[in-house]
Amino acid sequence: MDSKEPTCMRTPVLITPEAEMGEEACRILRMYSASKTTVEPGEMKKFQALSQKWWDRNGEFAALHSLNDLRVPFIRDRLLMYSEKTHLGYPLDGFRILDVGCGGGLLCEPLGRLGAAVVGIDPLEENIRTAELHQSFDPVLTRQVEYTTCALEEMAMEATGTFDAVVASEVVEHVSDLETFIGCAAQVLKPEGSLFITTINRTFLSYAMAIIAAEHLLRVVPSGTHEWGKFISPEELETFLTSSGFSVEAVNGMLFNPLFGSWTWISNCSVNYALHAVKKKQSGDVSGRTNGREHGSERSESSGSPTDKL
């Protein structure tokens, strides 16, 4: 990867004059000078205990391994909707993707193999060490994927308008400040860049399936992984996204079958869902798209098969 890829700074940030940085960048820096964070200490403790188990396909993260069967094509196909590039072997060549809360790199690796230049960040150092160790066995991944220990708000202070896409998969239900989190995602994206989120709706059915069944009865997820009060509906999430300058382009329901350990697209978002939003181009912005094509206005919702809409 490019040696100039941003890495989160561990030293105090020097705030340069607003005339040099721009109003939005200065706003972000002022925000975090007040020690605002999206990292929840309690959530850190949960995942610290599991940091060595990311690559056990039959272990605690088995559901995330199988989720790649849906989320990787979803990300790939939505990005390629607006791209005129054709590279059969590496369809995401030329795309710069930030994977927030990357854990052990379960999503970074397949995106890197598709040709994307991927930066995976996680506030837990143990997760990053696990990701780097697994990456080290594949020369292709060492070129395509870079990992660093930091939170999204730290990246936002030094990587304004850097990425074509930001991915937050099974992350937003664990953050302490969703509004700040989405604002930081907007900050690091190029104009017309894509934000991909997979998460859990806050419904009685999601409580029954994601907590009672998955955590306590079937034990396919460690007990205490989720808190129902932190789940968020697509409508609530869209409100946050709209206020941060995003346009929601697709919302698709997903369902996990614990008996077979597999995921499928379904026609409603009552439990899990995947969302694609695009950062609106502001007046004076240069398009961040590599091809200059205008972004489509058609939105797909709760599709049983997203490829029908893509």
Q: Which residue stretches match the model-derived regions?
A:
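Acceptor-substrate binding/catalytic loop of class I
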Residues: 199, 218-236
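Short alpha-helix
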Residues: 229-245, 251
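Conserved SAM-binding loop
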Residues: 87-90, 95-207, 237, 275-277
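Core SAM-dependent methyltransferase catalytic element
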Residues: 262-310
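N-terminal, positively charged/glycine-rich alpha-helical extensions of SAM-dependent methyltransferases
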Residues: 20-61, 65, 69, 310
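N-terminal chloroplast transit peptides
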Residues: 1-15
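Conserved alpha-helix/loop element of class I SAM-dependent methyltransferases that forms part
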Residues: 66-93
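Short, flexible, mixed-charge acidic loops at enzyme active sites
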Residues: 206-216
